[in-house]
Amino acid sequence: MKFRLILISLVVFFLILSVNDFQIYAESKTSSNKRFIDNKDGTISDSKTGLMWIKNDSFLHSGHWINWSEAKAYINDLNKTGYANYFDWKLPTTRELKTLYDAEKINSSQVGREMKIHIDPLFGKNGSGSLWSMNGNGRHNAFGVVFNTGDVFSANKYSRSRKATRGVRIFSYNK
């Protein structure tokens, strides 16, 4: 009888534990305006644009700034490893990057600076305020976006000065 009571207690305990774990996993975070959804796999979906972004920029992943060629290599590595089980990551266009800028929101400050990063707080904190895009600008320069102003910048492709990137892909809800 005592053994049976212990067995029933253990079964009930593990059932409660399983239900709680499922609820925690099933509840995804959304931004205050419900536009961005944290997929809990290192990605964030944008319901307005249909784009899926990597939550943390390349600086937060690697701990160092990158130039434009390294940004392309970073994206290739995401695809080789199948980051979040996707193999179609790309460098964003300047237009895609600009969709992340929101003057009303402050994510954090750029690491090592007072520069405020104006993107949704669901994204990783204290990353780079300047992200490379896929758009080249002549032979030696490439474009990106600065997230304290939302402006497009053009810099030498070999410049690493406080620059990173963030992978993007087109998503559908039918993963």
Region annotations inferred by a language model:
Residues 17-34, 108-112:
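Short, basic/low-complexity N-terminal boundary segments at the transition from targeting/disordered tails
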Residues 25-89, 164-168:
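Extracellular adhesion/carbohydrate-recognition regions
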Residues 72-88, 94-144:
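An exposed tryptophan-centered "aromatic clamp" motif
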Residues 145-155:
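Low-complexity, intrinsically disordered Gly/Pro/Thr-rich segments
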